[in-house]
Amino acid sequence: WAREMKETFGAKNPRSWLMRFHTQTAGASLTAQQPEINVVRVALQALAGVLGGTQSLHTNSLDEALALPSAEAVTIALRTQQIIAEESGVTNTIDPLGGSFFVEAETNRIEAEAYDYFRRIEDLGGMLPAIEKGFFQSEISDAAYRYQREIDENKRRIIGVNAYNDEKEVKVPILKMDPEGYEKQKARLDEIRKTRDNEKVTKSLERLKNACEGTENTMPFILDSVREYATLGEIVNVMKDVFGEYEEPTWI
């Protein structure tokens, strides 16, 4: 980041050389089998993020491979962060792993691979052509496919999935949405539709459609529609009429 800011973009202010980033633990690594051990996975990933200098952190909950997280699971995820912050001592040093041969070697390897990606993107004509050609979607799907193949072929061991399996089913509390909450929200929405100025809503959505059909920034028009109490569905439908729906690109 610092090298690109200085050498490619000519940034003069040293503060702009600082890379600020957020970390979220890997939801894709959570397993429905033996879900309680997801706590360990999340703790290790969170610790890695803190050791790497993350400015903010989201820890996934242990039950997210099964459903939306329960209040109990969310609390454990929060306590994981608090233990790392206040009990582990890793936050007492700015860069605890600085100077480690392994970390420095990995840093150099990742940097080299990043520059290889930069080159490949430029060869495709830049970011927009790369998006249009499905390059990024292809890279992500290929990585996901390789990851799953490694698990299926036992080349990558996942505890509870293809290693140290436990026939005993462990049940964790699953969040169940209250049907009454749905009915209350539906009633609120019906009331808003009755009491809002529908003429203003229609006009705001028309302005949004015009912006979508042109080259203007659509965000101000989205916010105007929200202020007139247009629903999310109404706003999305306007944009869908203009832009269509996402279709996975074919990458050859």
What are these regions (language model features)?
Residues 2-37, 119:
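Gly/Pro-rich turn-and-neighbor structural signature
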